[in-house]
Design a protein with these regions (language model features):
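Class I SAM-dependent methyltransferase SAM/SAH-binding core
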Residues: 54, 62-110
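N-terminal, positively charged/glycine-rich alpha-helical extensions of SAM-dependent methyltransferases
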Residues: 1-19
Length: 237
């Protein structure tokens, strides 16, 4: 098993921001939104009117905006530590004509104890591997969540060899700009395994959440926050 090599926590370099803002991640972004819908359907649940949907590590706001489109009766908040990413996301919001009451972006650093209205959904995509201490994310969930909050966190998972990293880079980013190729390789080195994430969740009192390997390179954490204080192993309370 390869050892983890952390990478910088914040992507605020102008070249990185421009590259990620210009890249087409529409397929993976849409997958996150569809997974949220599937998890709701599986639990016969729905978001109430004016529910708060929270996207942690939102970057240029791709998934945040998709959440606002999919659930227009909800209030969506994207948080990121990089002010340049937030600026890009908010510029896109204004260009789309979406009011800040429905979609808002703010700069914030983990861990968080509150972000205004408690969240009925907390998602992140490719945030976990940036954190030098993963408990910065997991310790934030309960304070941010409403009494019944759905969570979905999707990230890369660390391969078991350098050869596997080479294969994934060749398969998925061979034609991408050099900055994205560099970052993708670094992110694979910095990501966690399924077993590591399970241990992190146990430490955070979130051991009832589901952790799955997905496709050839992802892992996914999903479930409902409510019930975790009692240690119940449930898909929804």
């Amino acid at each position: 098993m390869m050892l983890r090599i952390p990478e910088p926590e914040v992507m605020n370099d102008p070249l990185q921001v421009d590259a990620y803002a210009a890249a087409d991640f529409s397929s993976t972004d849409q997958t996150v939104v569809e997974r949220v819908a599937m998890l709701l359907q599986a639990s016969a649940a729905s978001f109430p009117d004016q529910a708060r949907l929270l996207d942690l590590g939102c970057g240029p706001g791709n998934i945040t905006a998709l959440l606002a489109q999919r659930w227009p009766h909800c209030s969506v908040l994207g948080l990121d530590a990089a002010d340049r990413m937030i600026a890009v996301a908010d510029e896109r919001r204004r260009a789309a004509g979406l009011p800040s009451e429905r979609l808002r972006y703010d700069k914030a650093l983990l861990p968080l104890q509150q972000a205004g209205q408690p969240a009925d959904l907390i998602v992140s995509n490719s945030l976990l591997h940036h954190l030098h201490d993963p408990q910065q994310l997991w310790s934030s969930l309960i304070p941010l969540a409403s009494p019944q909050c759905l969570v979905l966190h999707r990230d890369l998972r660390r391969p078991d060899s350098e050869a596997s990293i080479d294969r994934l880079c060749q398969c998925h980013v061979a034609d991408a700009p050099s900055v994205l190729q560099r970052d993708y390789r670094a992110s694979l080195h910095a990501s966690f395994t399924v077993e590591e994430v399970k241990a992190q969740l146990l430490l955070a009192g979130l051991g009832h959440l589901q952790v799955d390997a997905v496709e050839d390179r992802y892992l996914e954490v999903s479930g409902w926050i409510a019930g975790c204080q009692a240690g119940s192993d449930v898909s929804r309370p």
